[in-house]
Amino acid sequence: MDSKKAILMLSLLAMALISSVMSARDLTETSTDAKKEVVEKTNEVNDAKYGGGYNHGGGYNGGGYNHGGGYNHGGGGYHNGGGGYNHGGGGYNGGGGHGGHGGGGYNGGGGHGGHGGGGYNGGGGHGGHGGAESVAVQTEEKTNEVNDAKYGGGSNYNDGRGGYNHGGGGYNHGGGGHGGHGGHGGHGGHGGHGAVQTEDNTQN
């Protein structure tokens, strides 16, 4: 009789132990799912604020094909790429960015902060040379490529504005100030935001 009671007690204890283990596992999975959901919701909010995906892409560490951006290492893409606070921008047309090492790309580099800009046409930078106005001017393009590599682009080519701390630049009214990138023809695009720069009238 005592052995039956002992077996019954052991069975009940085993069932209780199994039940508690399963409950703990369920709680852990629920907690993990809840954390994932919070992260996803946060990412959705940040995507809504800063962009994400192929068009207007970005997010915190984003990119995307068109109008990319984001906070850290953001941006890139083929058209109007770039932006982001650190290491932002690039892309084929209209780079940019705010913070260190911003901008770049083929048309209209730029950036705000140290080592901004570059690119083939309308690169950013202070005191370099803007992109060539015509593809036919081969020697000037080569000179500009060298100067882009040395200075990150430049100022005062068809009203292109010189940058401050390697920002802005370009030709045909491109860039300027802290941030804005050059742009190839027309008015330069819009790069990262920065402090207002006192314009140097000697460059105009």
Swiss-Prot record:
Keyword tags: Repeat, Stress response
Induction pattern: By cold stress, abscisic acid (ABA) and water stress.
Statement: the UniProt record of this protein carries the keyword Disulfide bond: no
Compositionally biased intervals (Gly residues): 169-194
Top-level taxonomic group: Eukaryota
UniProt-annotated stretches for the region Disordered: 169-204
Purpose: May be involved in resistance of the plant to environmental stress.
UniProt-listed PANTHER family: GEO07177P1 (PTHR37372:SF1), OS06G0316800 PROTEIN (PTHR37372)
Name of the protein this chain belongs to: Cold and drought-regulated protein CORA
Origin species: Medicago sativa
